[in-house]
Design a protein with these regions (language model features):
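Short helix/strand-bridging catalytic loops that position acidic/His residues to coordinate divalent metals
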Residues: 33-46, 70-86
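Short acidic alpha-helical/loop segments enriched in Asp/Glu that coordinate divalent cations
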Residues: 9-15, 64-76, 108-115
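Secondary-structure boundary elements
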Residues: 1-12, 56, 60, 102-106
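Auxiliary, metal-adjacent structural segments of Zn-dependent hydrolase domains
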Residues: 1-29, 91
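Pan-zinc metallopeptidase signature
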Residues: 112-164
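Active-site recognition of the HExxH zinc-binding catalytic motif
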Residues: 48-67
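Short, flexible loop/turn elements at secondary-structure junctions
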Residues: 17-23, 38-43, 59, 95
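Post-HExxH zinc-binding segment in Zn-dependent metallohydrolases
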Residues: 74-129
Length: 164
């Protein structure tokens, strides 16, 4: 629902569990085939954030190239007159945050109240992180904004950080 891209009905997703899966412990090549690769010896594989990692990596299929989320960022940026470089990781930090927040809410329902999302525990895309950016994504999650309005607000937050 959050990506606005339906799961492909005839697409199989291969998941490979391996000892080493790069510096991050997981990755997802999306071209030519979609494949999730996850390390089983990464320290996080024994923690609840392992589930978030699987969810995040699988969600790359929904936040893929030419997907609605990435296209919205690109089109909004191109149509605007932003005084900053194109934020090429905005789609990915959004994916991290949305997956992390969904997992946090689901974990809370089963009694895991102190869960902190991978984006924060591993300081991923730290330069993008801000309370303002997270507030915009939270509003989007609560159906408070359309994707285009969310994209405009996200770019506005990043531009104000750049110019301060």
């Amino acid at each position: 629902r959050l990506s606005l891209t339906p799961w492909p009905s005839k697409k199989k997703v291969r998941v490979d569990l391996t000892v080493y899966a790069n510096y991050a412990g997981a990755y997802t090549p999306t071209r030519p085939l979609f494949n999730v690769v996850v390390s089983t010896v990464d320290p996080s594989s024994l923690e609840p954030d392992f589930l978030e990692t699987i969810f995040h990596e699988g969600s790359h299929l929904l936040f893929r190239y030419e997907g609605k989320w990435r296209e919205s960022i690109f089109q909004t940026f191109e149509a605007g007159s932003y005084q900053m470089k194109f934020p090429r990781h905005l789609w990915h930090v959004s994916l991290f945050y949305l997956c992390g927040q969904v997992c946090k809410e689901e974990f809370a329902q089963i009694g895991i109240k102190e869960y902190e999302m991978v984006l924060l525990t591993r300081n991923i895309f730290k330069s993008y992180q801000s309370d303002e950016l997270f507030a915009v994504l939270n509003q989007y999650m609560q159906n408070g904004h359309t994707l285009s309005a969310t994209t405009e607000q996200l770019l506005g937050v990043l531009e104000s950080k750049t110019n301060n």
